[in-house]
Amino acid sequence: DYCMRFYERQFTTREQVNKDIIVRFERLLDDYFDSDGPLREGLPTVKYFADKVFLSANYFGDMIRKQTGQTASEYIQNKLIERAKEALLGTDKTTSEIAYGLGFQYPQHLSRMFKRVTGYTPNEFRSQN
């Protein structure tokens, strides 16, 4: 009886800790893109965020996958695409300006990733929406 209560408490506590880390990761991602991080450091990496939450990159990546069903890299990539969509629809910036603002070294990399994920080039997406 005691062992089961202890086990359940450990499991429940771990689940909550993992959810808290996901929330922190989401906040850190937003803070990164809202700051000059992309201009200073380029595209964010899994290691960068793992360091911020004091976990190894491998453990952090495994935890993100278990909680979200996506790898940490996919999660970051989806946030990049979401931010690119917002900029395409909410500003008059060129695709190049958006790419550099998100931390891409070359605008073509954003265009390629955007097309792979959405099925549209950034310009096609902008004109259709």
Language-model region placement:
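Compact structured core domains
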Residues: D1-E15
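A short, Lys/Arg-enriched amphipathic alpha-helix from helix-turn-helix/homeodomain DNA-binding modules
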Residues: E15-V53, E74-K93
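Residues within helix-turn-helix
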Residues: K47, N58, T94-E97, P107-Q108
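Residues within the helices of the helix-turn-helix
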Residues: K47, S73, S96, R112, ...
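Core residues of bacterial helix-turn-helix
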Residues: V53, I64, L102-G103, F114
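Short hydrophobic/aromatic patch on the recognition helix
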Residues: F60, H109-L110, F114
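Terminal helix-turn-helix DNA-binding modules in bacterial transcription factors
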Residues: Q67-Q105, S127-N129
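…primarily DNA-binding HTH/wHTH and HhH modules…
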Residues: R112-N129
